């Protein structure tokens, strides 16, 4: 039943709305993903490595505190475009360590630990901390997750949406904009409750799905969503089962295995990034409809293919829009076929 879940969300929203956010007292200490961060004042120069953190800061009216961005999957939301156009993009993907520190940041906000972490493509947290530059890693990518196992890490427990609310609250505290953070979290919780209600009346007892992010080459095993990750949370919240059983965040699974599972829906990522051929969702669609293995899947034959922005599959503000889009799409399908 989804109704208890809705009640819990509404209760959390009401309690949050009643609480009065207190201003930040500096010096501030924040415990973050195994590191202790210290702030003498609200950061005035921030570099973001990851679109999720960038758009969180924009949503709280902190765009003027951002001096450099990087790691983009989709174009920035239209409502943030004017602000984003004023800020240097250090890289579409991972920036160099030198380009980040060259912006003289007082904070580096990081979406993914494989960017800044023990084996970080940009550097380690210690490298930044030795220069007195704190690094804030979004909790969704470190809590109950081992990023040293599997290409994109392995979930030790199912993703918890509370980690997104925690990111918003902690960033709001760091920048002393707690009321903005509280308001944003209340909006996110209300959006989630609405999406769950949309799917409530649909008979989805045996419905299943596969989420295809990308592929290094079109003719090899695709990167798909594991069963404890963020897309799995999105599906299960709406009463849909993920056909992938791996604990890895984005494991590769063969199309023969996927076809045998024959998911009710296929969810594919749309992105503006062009690192891999399958980053282009139109190439994904063409492959699904032409490959002799995939074209006979029920989801392909009955056109039950849902297209979501890649960032809607990440622990980001866009995930809530993604859940709403999923709920609306699923609600519109005739599952009697």
What is the predicted role of each segment?
Residues 45-118:
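A short, structured surface patch at a secondary-structure boundary
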Residues 74-75, 221-250:
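Alpha-helical, coiled-coil/dimerization segments enriched in small aliphatic residues
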Residues 52-55, 72-75, 107-108, 113-118, ...:
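Solvent-exposed loop/turn segments at secondary-structure junctions
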Residues 115-123, 133-170, 202-230:
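Extracytoplasmic ligand-binding site segments that recognize negatively charged/polar headgroups
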Residues 7-17:
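Bacterial N-terminal signal peptides
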Residues 32-34, 88-98, 141, 247-255:
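Short helix-initiation/N-cap motifs at beta->coil->alpha
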Residues 19-55, 157, 173-212, 330-337:
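Bacterial Sec-exported substrate-binding components of ABC uptake systems
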Residues 158-167, 268-337:
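Structured C-terminal subdomain patch of bacterial secreted/periplasmic proteins
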């Amino acid at each position: 039943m989804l109704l208890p879940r809705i009640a819990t969300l509404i209760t959390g929203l009401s309690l949050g709305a009643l609480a009065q956010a207190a201003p930040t007292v500096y010096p501030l200490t924040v415990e973050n993903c195994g590191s202790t961060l210290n702030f003498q004042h609200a950061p005035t120069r921030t570099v973001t490595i990851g679109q999720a953190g960038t758009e969180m800061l924009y949503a709280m009216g902190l765009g003027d505190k951002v001096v450099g961005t990087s790691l983009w999957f989709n174009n920035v939301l239209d409502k943030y475009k004017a602000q984003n156009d004023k800020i240097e993009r250090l890289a579409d993907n991972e920036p160099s360590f030198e380009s980040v520190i060259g912006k003289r940041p007082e904070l580096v906000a990081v979406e993914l630990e494989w960017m800044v972490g023990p084996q970080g493509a940009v550097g380690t947290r210690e490298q930044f901390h030795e220069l007195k530059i704190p690094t804030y890693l979004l909790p969704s990518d470190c809590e109950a997750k081992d990023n040293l196992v599997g290409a994109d890490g392995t979930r030790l427990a199912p993703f918890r949406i509370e980690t997104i609310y925690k990111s918003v609250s902690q960033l709001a505290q760091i920048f002393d904009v707690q009321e903005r953070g509280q308001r944003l979290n209340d909006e996110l919780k209300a959006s989630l409750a609405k999406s769950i209600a949309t799917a409530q009346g649909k008979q989805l007892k045996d419905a299943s799905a596969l989420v295809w992010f990308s592929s290094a080459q079109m003719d090899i095993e695709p990167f798909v969503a594991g069963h404890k990750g963020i897309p799995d949370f999105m599906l299960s919240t709406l009463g849909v089962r993920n056909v992938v059983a791996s604990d890895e965040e984005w494991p590769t699974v063969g199309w023969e295995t996927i076809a045998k599972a024959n998911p009710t829906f296929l969810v594919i990522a749309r992105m503006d990034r062009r690192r891999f051929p399958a980053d282009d969702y139109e190439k994904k669609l063409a492959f699904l409809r032409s490959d002799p293995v995939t074209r006979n899947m029920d989801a392909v034959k009955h056109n039950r293919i849902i297209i979501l922005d890649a960032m809607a599959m990440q622990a980001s503000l866009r995930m809530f829009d993604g859940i709403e889009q999923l709920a609306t799409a699923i609600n519109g399908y005739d599952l009697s076929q």
